[in-house]
């Protein structure tokens, strides 16, 4: 049973819960793709949506450290299984192979002790990789190299492909957050923590005086790291929090430079630059954008001029509210029978396996407003190789923003 079938199966058993191609122009988002334009969670298995009262240290990595403090395993940087050779942190053989169709299929097996809700949470975290990148996690058949995802003593992973069956520990309870699962899977793909980049001193200052000697190796810099020619990402799912490993309450161990007020770390999951790095490392061509905003707008590339042929783009909207309302202001897609050519499709969640809110829609009639049941909504735009039209323009708001507008009125 592959990932798609497992998701359908678990969705049937249980109620649903809850790049880089750079986009042409964007505001109020950090975006990824050539065919779109942009302006501008909560079950126990989704990283909770942030609130205005969240602590700046309430980030994914600090949750990992809290769980791992009782682990008996020796871990580098808090959650990485040491390799036999230090030079392996820049090895070309640590990456998973790409198939002829451009997809990177990574076999996995799941711990049989996981319950159905644990499985659902892990599969939903995996599904975002498949939606936003060319990484597909597939159930193992007979492959030699594969991931063993099990509930061991904490949240941890190997760095990259090590050969044979390799463990990704996702402990029941403490590690069952989408952001944590994605953090550990990103290690398995071959990514280190963001602060260990060779160019990190241009972007952050390490406050060594607040780091105990035993923890200083966790802040080492890899001089030969592969930065992929992409910017440093303060909001990466792989970034430490500002006070990670501090030995003095209230004193930061990592300070952004030159602007120390920049927030580092987050609790939602993959960032746009995380997605961009995956796609560049694995030579993927994906048109995908993550929008972390309470309101904004999006439109097809070239709008109001005609969009391009053979487009396949997605936008993942993540808000602080429970619900998202999508309103199409203009809509003009080539009409075909059953909308099998060009279409827009909207999902109630973060992947193409999520429930459908608006099925394939084409033509020139403006669709009715679409409202999600959670803080996540995915919009998919697909075109074939035939004639095109002017495309679409849409705006979105969160329930929180709507309440504010209603209060003012």
From Swiss-Prot:
Residue span, Peptidase M12A domain: 87-285
Prosequence residues removed at maturation: 20-86
A molecular-function term among this protein's GO annotations: peptidase activity
Keyword rRNA-binding among UniProt keywords: no
Its EC number(s): 3.4.24.-
Keywords per UniProt: Cell membrane, Cytoplasm, Cytoplasmic vesicle, Disulfide bond, Fertilization, Hydrolase, Membrane, Metal-binding, Metalloprotease, Protease, Signal, Zinc, Zymogen
Sequence positions that bind Zn(2+): 183, 187, 193
Cystine pairings recorded for this chain: 91-94, 134-284, 155-175, 287-313, 339-362
InterPro entries: CUB_dom, Hatching_enzyme_Uvs2-like, MetalloPept_cat_dom_sf, Peptidase_M12A, Peptidase_Metallo, Sperma_CUB_dom_sf, ZnMP_hatching_enz
Main localisation: cytoplasm
Cofactor: Zn(2+)
CDD domains: CUB, ZnMc_hatching_enzyme
Bias type Low complexity, positions: 30-42
Secretion signal span: 1-19
Region (Disordered): 30-55
Pfam families according to UniProt: Astacin, CUB
Superkingdom of origin organism: Eukaryota
Domain CUB: residue ranges: 287-399
GO cellular component: cortical granule; cytoplasm; plasma membrane
Locations listed in the record: Cytoplasm; Cell membrane; Cytoplasmic vesicle, Secretory vesicle, Cortical granule
Manner of cofactor binding, per the entry note: Binds 1 zinc ion per subunit.
GO annotation terms (biological process): cell adhesion; fertilization; negative regulation of binding of sperm to zona pellucida; positive regulation of protein processing; prevention of polyspermy; proteolysis
Enzyme class: hydrolase
Active-site residue list: 184
Physiological role: Probable oocyte-specific oolemmal receptor involved in sperm and egg adhesion and fertilization. Protease which may play a role in the breaking down of the vitelline membrane (days 0-5) and possibly, in the digestion of the egg white (days 9-12).
Protein name, UniProt field: Astacin-like metalloendopeptidase
Protein's organism: Coturnix japonica (Japanese quail)
């Amino acid at each position: 049973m592959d990932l798609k079938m497992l998701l359908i199966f678990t969705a049937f058993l249980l109620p649903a819960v809850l790049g880089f191609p750079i986009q042409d122009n964007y505001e109020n988002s950090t975006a990824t793709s050539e065919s779109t334009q942009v302006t501008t969670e909560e079950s126990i298995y989704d990283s909770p949506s942030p609130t205005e009262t969240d602590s700046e240290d309430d980030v994914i990595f600090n949750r990992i450290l809290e769980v791992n403090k009782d682990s008996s395993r020796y871990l580098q940087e808090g959650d990485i299984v040491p390799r036999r050779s230090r030079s392996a942190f820049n090895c070309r053989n640590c990456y998973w192979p790409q198939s002829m169709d451009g997809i990177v299929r990574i076999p996995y097996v799941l711990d049989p002790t996981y319950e159905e809700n644990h499985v659902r949470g892990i599969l939903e975290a995996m599904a975002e990789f498949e939606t936003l990148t060319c990484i597909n996690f597939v159930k193992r058949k007979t492959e030699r190299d594969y991931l063993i995802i099990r509930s061991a003593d904490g949240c941890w992973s190997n760095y990259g492909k090590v050969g044979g069956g390799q463990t990704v520990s996702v402990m029941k309870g403490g590690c069952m957050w989408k952001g944590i699962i994605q953090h550990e899977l990103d290690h398995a793909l071959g990514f280190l923590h963001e602060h260990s980049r060779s160019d990190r001193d241009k972007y952050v200052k390490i406050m060594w005086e607040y780091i105990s000697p035993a923890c200083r190796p966790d802040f080492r810099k890899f001089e030969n790291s592969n930065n992929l020619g992409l910017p440093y990402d303060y909001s990466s799912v792989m970034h430490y929090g500002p006070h990670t490993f501090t030995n003095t309450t209230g004193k930061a161990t990592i300070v952004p430079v030159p602007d120390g007020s920049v927030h580092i770390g987050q609790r939602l999951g993959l960032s746009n630059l995380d997605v961009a790095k995956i796609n560049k490392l694995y030579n993927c061509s994906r048109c995908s954008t993550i929008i972390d905003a309470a309101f904004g707008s999006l439109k097809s590339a070239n709008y109001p001029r005609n969009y391009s042929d053979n487009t396949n783009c997605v936008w993942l909207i993540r808000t602080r509210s429970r619900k998202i309302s999508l309103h199409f202001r203009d809509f003009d897609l080539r009409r075909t029978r059953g909308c099998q050519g060009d279409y827009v499709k909207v999902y109630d969640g973060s992947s193409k396996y999520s429930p459908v809110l608006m099925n394939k829609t084409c033509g020139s009639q403006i669709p009715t407003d679409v409202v999600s049941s959670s803080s996540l909504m995915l919009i998919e735009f697909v075109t074939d190789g035939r004639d095109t039209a002017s495309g679409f323009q849409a705006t979105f708001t969160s329930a929180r923003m709507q309440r504010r507008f209603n209060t003012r009125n």
